[in-house]
From Swiss-Prot:
Keywords: Mitochondrion. InterPro entries: DNA/RNA_pol_sf, RNA_pol_mitovir. This is Uncharacterized mitochondrial protein AtMg01410. Its main location: mitochondrion. The lineage of its organism: Eukaryota, Viridiplantae, Streptophyta, Embryophyta, Tracheophyta. It is found in: Mitochondrion.
Length: 204
């Protein structure tokens, strides 16, 4: 069901991995974000809101709460009033559940749309490409909102594997106070102005 919806999105690379990225060739700025363990940290409450928005609350409860968060475990080493503590998933994708990845991938699109709406209200945003947990956004302001939104969801960005225009990258470094970092030019031509951020320990 969700796979069919994504097939109709020209910005989705599930069924053609290069096509959505080819559309962005020639963009002035492109921000490629690599997410850290996105499928493990993607909050179920966000998935619930996405499915509820697309369908209804009852369907969202069945898909997300009953399927994704149905695994309840007893923790024997933590006791609460003479009984074992019970825990369940509040983030991530359960192994073996067929619908978890398509739901996550579609929610990734919706997150980008929401970010774009904050910057360009009333405008259909198409200057991006999504392939599962990988995303390229060809708009500086939308990319900033996306980065902030991920922080709100508790999902981290691997800046060592992300590609960000040098001017924006330097401003991010100055704002965050990250001093233990170096820049290494990748295979991109010098005039592209694109650098890869790598940590010092990773170069050792």
């Amino acid at each position: 069901m969700f796979g069919g919806r994504r097939r109709r999105l020209p910005q989705d690379g599930t069924f053609n991995q290069t096509q959505p990225f080819d559309r962005l060739v020639g963009s002035r700025h492109s921000f490629s974000f690599d997410l850290k363990s996105a499928t493990d940290r993607w909050p179920l409450v966000f998935l619930f809101e996405v499915v509820q928005y697309l369908f209804d609350r009852s369907f969202a409860s069945s898909v997300v709460n009953s399927a994704f968060a149905c695994n309840i475990f007893e923790v024997p080493f933590v006791k609460l009033k003479r009984r074992f503590s019970q825990v369940c998933f509040v983030a991530g994708q359960p192994l073996g559940y067929h619908g978890s990845w398509p739901t996550f991938a579609l929610s990734h699109h919706i997150l980008v749309w929401w970010c774009a709406k904050q910057v360009h209200p009333g405008v259909r945003f198409t200057s991006y490409a999504v392939l599962g947990d990988d995303v390229v956004i060809a708009d500086q302001e939308v990319a900033k909102v996306y980065e902030s939104a991920l922080g709100g969801l508790g999902v981290k960005i691997s800046y060592q594997k992300s590609l960000i225009p040098i001017q924006v990258l330097l401003s991010l470094l100055n704002a965050s106070g990250l001093g233990n970092l170096v820049l290494k030019r990748e295979i991109f031509p010098r005039e592209s102005g694109v650098l890869s951020l790598m940590s010092v320990p990773s170069l050792a």
